């Protein structure tokens, strides 16, 4: 099987809008591999995650090996390779947030959501993911829900914060 050929068991097709957006991005770069991160973001924005079949479809549009696209997809923690909840919670577990008490935040999240890191709530509302650093070290402990950064967190603030995200 050719490296870019998609296995027959995984039927996947980019939408016309996804294909057009990826083609548009491709022309902004001298090397089409450079467009792979943008292509992955395009698919994720439409689907919520990047299924295996999308890797092959993106590689086909960009004219590069699927292994190159997979390498980019697995390098960046913001690209989801499995389904996630409607809201993704990323709590910082760096050394600085450790010092400022992320463990209490993690425990409060686990208790309120009834899940462990890497899991999604039964109703599909939240996925809980640890992350190395959110780049907001002077305001720890920190976490992000979707694109919203929350700083100077306390375990007591977690229930009310979660209620904002339906």
Curated annotation (Swiss-Prot):
It catalyses: a quinone + NADH + 5 H(+)(in) = a quinol + NAD(+) + 4 H(+)(out). It comes from the Bacteria. The lineage of its organism: Bacteria, Pseudomonadati, Pseudomonadota, Gammaproteobacteria, Enterobacterales. Its EC number is 7.1.1.-. Composed of 13 different subunits. Subunits NuoCD, E, F, and G constitute the peripheral sector of the complex. Its cofactor is [2Fe-2S] cluster. It is an enzyme of class 7 (translocase). The keyword Protein biosynthesis does not apply. Keywords: 2Fe-2S, Iron, Iron-sulfur, Metal-binding, NAD, Quinone, Translocase, Ubiquinone. NDH-1 shuttles electrons from NADH, via FMN and iron-sulfur (Fe-S) centers, to quinones in the respiratory chain. The immediate electron acceptor for the enzyme in this species is believed to be ubiquinone. Couples the redox reaction to proton translocation (for every two electrons transferred, four hydrogen ions are translocated across the cytoplasmic membrane), and thus conserves the redox energy in a proton gradient. Signal peptide: none annotated. This is NADH-quinone oxidoreductase subunit E. One of its GO terms (molecular function) is metal ion binding. It comes from Salmonella typhimurium (strain LT2 / SGSC1412 / ATCC 700720). Pfam families: 2Fe-2S_thioredx. [2Fe-2S] cluster binds at residues 92, 97, 133, 137.
């Amino acid at each position: 099987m050719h490296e870019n050929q998609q296995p027959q068991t995984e039927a996947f097709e980019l939408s016309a809008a996804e294909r057009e957006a990826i083609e548009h991005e491709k022309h902004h770069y001298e090397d089409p591999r450079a467009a792979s991160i943008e292509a992955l973001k395009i698919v994720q924005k439409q689907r919520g995650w990047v299924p295996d079949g999308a890797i092959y479809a993106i590689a086909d549009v960009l004219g590069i090996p699927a292994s190159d696209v997979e390498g980019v997809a697995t390098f960046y923690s913001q690209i989801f390779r499995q389904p996630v909840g409607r809201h993704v919670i990323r709590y910082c577990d760096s050394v600085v947030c450790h010092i400022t008490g992320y463990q209490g935040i993690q425990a409060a999240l686990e208790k309120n959501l009834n899940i462990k890191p890497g899991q999604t709530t039964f109703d599909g509302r939240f996925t809980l993911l640890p992350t190395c650093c959110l780049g907001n070290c002077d305001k720890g402990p920190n976490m992000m829900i979707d694109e919203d950064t929350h700083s100077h967190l306390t375990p007591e603030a977690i229930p009310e914060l979660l209620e904002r995200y339906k």
